[in-house]
Amino acid sequence: MIALDTNVLVRLVLHDDETQARAAERLLVRARREQTELFVADVVLCELVWVLTRRAGLSREDIAAALDQLLRTELFVVGDAAKIERALAAYRAGKGDFADYLIREQARAAGAREVATFDRSLKGETDFRVL
């Protein structure tokens, strides 16, 4: 297994640096050939969404589609796919950031009854308490 940093996924999605995008694609080809999984940590997904939103200006729909494609590709492995898929569904439907919904999923798994936040965009969202 090989763990990926955020910048590798950014290059694969955006192709904003052709040299690095080609190197990232070669890594995928090698991983497929060698039947090696590519691990994507939760924080990498959060950083990826941030970059795609803030730097690339992609829409929520486009970002959700990119994450969905990543989750459906057998080559990529994530920590807890069910939590990530629930967070992704909430991101598609809600107003918060993907990271907010992933935090909520991890908090629920840890037994927390709510997530305290100052983020006003989460007002009215289930299991968030805006302070």
Predicted regions and their residues:
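Active-site neighborhoods of divalent-metal-dependent phosphate/nucleic-acid chemistry enzymes
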Residues: 74-114
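Glycine/small-residue-rich phosphate/adenosyl-binding loop
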Residues: 57-71, 75
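Short, well-structured N-terminal submotif of metal-dependent ribonuclease cores
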Residues: 1-40, 55-62
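Histidine- and aromatic-rich ligand-binding microenvironments
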Residues: 5, 40-41, 96-97, 119-120, ...
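Amphipathic alpha-helical segments within well-ordered protein domains
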Residues: 49-53, 88
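Acidic, PIN/NYN-like endoribonuclease modules and their adjacent C-terminal/linker elements
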Residues: 1, 104-131
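A generic structural signal for short hydrophobic patches within well-formed alpha-helices
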Residues: 9, 45, 122-123
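Structured helix-beta-strand junction loops
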Residues: 34-35, 73, 94, 125
